[in-house]
């Protein structure tokens, strides 16, 4: 009997629109591009040999729009009758939780940082800097709020009200999807939302996570959800098409996959330098609303 395949899709780093990118020159970390991940989910849906997906999420979030795009792609994949199981890494917060919310099951380690269900947004006003440097700036626009995000001036009252509504609507959309995906009442979600951060164990106690377990536990759960019997051989398939234009899939061995999915305590990170922080936020340039942890937790 031919083996059944369980696909592994990585959501690692800052969630952005467009293609995924590798680590920056100064250690700013890689990005999980919604376009890349959507392509991988579509490929997994269309391959008959693939019976389930394990979504490995290690991300503090990023673009709210990109997170919603990935959430929709996960839901579309599930409508094909194939399950999605999430395996959380060291951090799966804000947008990282958004993309996980509708999974058939969510696994986290007891020390995973997750939750942070909330959105932030705003803009930098350079008006004072321009005045100090003697720079004259003329703005031509058409329409009441056409220049709302111009850096040459702060929000006026009307623009602020419009942007505040946009933030509130996005937050409501986020919490609604958590409520549906986790079979929770809206009031229950509010008690754990509003940006609150939880450990994996605390998240399980609050129904944000199903089980405490590692990557192999998530794979076994995907096998069960897909109805693959214990006597059937299962092969893991790493869907990796970064840098390709044809969406081709590379199949890596279990050893290679496990090396990629080392526990957080065995991964080396370098995101503490100012240049790394600059790279991190540069990747979110142009995004108006963010589903991202607005700080970095460092355990010493």
Question: Which residues are covered by each model-predicted region?
Answer:
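Intrinsically disordered, low-complexity segments enriched in small/flexible residues
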Residues: 1-45, 49, 56, 141-144, ...
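Cleft-lining beta-strand/loop regions that shape enzyme active-site pockets
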Residues: 1-129, 168
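Generic, ordered loop/turn and secondary-structure boundary motif
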Residues: 16, 92, 114-121, 156, ...
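Acidic/histidine-enriched alpha-helical segments
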Residues: 57-62, 91-94, 117, 190, ...
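Short glycine/threonine-rich loop-to-helix capping motif typified by GTGT followed
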Residues: 64-69, 202-205, 248-253
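Charge-rich, low-complexity amphipathic helices
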Residues: 66, 92, 99-100, 121-123, ...
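A structural micro-motif
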Residues: 82, 135, 232-234
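Charged, glycine-interspersed solvent-exposed loop segments at helix/strand-loop junctions
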Residues: 127, 131-229
């Amino acid at each position: 009997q031919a083996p059944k395949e369980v696909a592994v899709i990585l959501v690692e780093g800052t969630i952005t629109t467009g293609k995924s990118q590798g680590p920056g020159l100064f250690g700013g970390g890689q990005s999980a591009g919604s376009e890349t991940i959507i392509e991988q989910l579509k490929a997994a849906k269309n391959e008959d040999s693939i019976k389930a997906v394990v979504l490995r999420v290690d991300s503090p979030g990023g673009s709210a729009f990109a997170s919603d795009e990935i959430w929709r792609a996960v839901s579309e994949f599930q409508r094909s009758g194939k399950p999605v199981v999430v395996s959380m890494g060291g951090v799966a917060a804000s947008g990282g939780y958004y993309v996980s919310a509708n999974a058939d099951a969510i696994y986290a380690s007891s020390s995973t940082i997750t939750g942070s269900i909330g959105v932030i947004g705003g803009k930098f006003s350079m008006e004072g800097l321009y005045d100090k440097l003697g720079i004259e700036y003329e703005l031509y626009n058409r329409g009441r709020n056409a220049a709302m995000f111009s850096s040459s001036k702060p929000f006026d009252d009307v623009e602020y009200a419009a942007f505040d509504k946009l933030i509130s609507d996005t937050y409501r959309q986020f919490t609604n999807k958590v409520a549906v995906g986790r079979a929770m009442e809206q009031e229950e979600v509010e008690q754990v939302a509003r940006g609150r951060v939880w450990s994996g164990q605390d998240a399980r106690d609050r129904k944000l996570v199903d089980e405490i377990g590692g990557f192999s536990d998530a794979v076994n759960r995907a096998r069960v959800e897909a109805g693959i019997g214990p006597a059937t051989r299962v092969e893991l398939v790493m869907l990796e098409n970064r840098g390709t234009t044809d969406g081709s899939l590379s199949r890596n061995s279990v050893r290679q996959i496990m090396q990629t999915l080392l526990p957080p305590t065995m991964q080396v990170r370098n995101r503490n330098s100012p240049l790394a922080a600059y790279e991190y936020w540069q990747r979110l340039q142009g995004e108006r609303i963010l589903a991202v942890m607005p700080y970095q937790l460092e355990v010493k």
